Amino acid sequence: MKLSKYAKLVKQSGSLYLCHVEDSGVWLGTRWGFYKANGLPETVDSDTIMTILDFDSKAAEKIVVQERDFETVHDMFGMDLSDDPAPDIEAKKIEVAAVYKGTFATALLCNDGELVFYDEAQLSPLADVFKESDYVQTVVRVDPAGRRYVVIRNGFDTEAGIMPVKIVSKEFLGDLSDFQARCTEQYFREESRAAALAAVQAAEAETGEQATMEGMDE
């Protein structure tokens, strides 16, 4: 886990969660995600973590710090962030992302057909994991209330849990439909232009070829 990347997310969200989990050690979080803090001692407290993250007193004033204790990693704010793969729902990243009214959302298509959107920037603390491992997997889990969230696994280990982003709405679908219609119109415009240009180039090539042959006859 890159603590410098995590610190940037903390500044952006204005929140820092320091979680002591009895069966899993220390986890760090923001409003949008929680990360396994491998290497941090279980005795770390809120003052120490602010020092480790290099937050001065001015920066600290803008950050709400919450230190929480959990009995099990199976229930952290309703999320199961255990290494147990049983709750995993397979999902694959869709190549088309959604950027809407300032929100950038990556979409995952679950194997049951449901879409889950999340902010991929929340994965920045795991940059070293993605770079160094060939076994990173993005899956989806469901909390007791039926809400889905994203889990990042590295082999047999769970590295993070990311909260979903709410982006699909009636207004979004209306704007998306209009955008799709305009893209379709633009596609046919460009196809028509390309066909017209190809016809002109073919005619010019034929004319040039005829002129060359006439010159040879003379």
PLM feature segments, named:
Residues 30-33, 39, 50-218:
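C-terminal functional regions that serve as terminal interaction/effector modules
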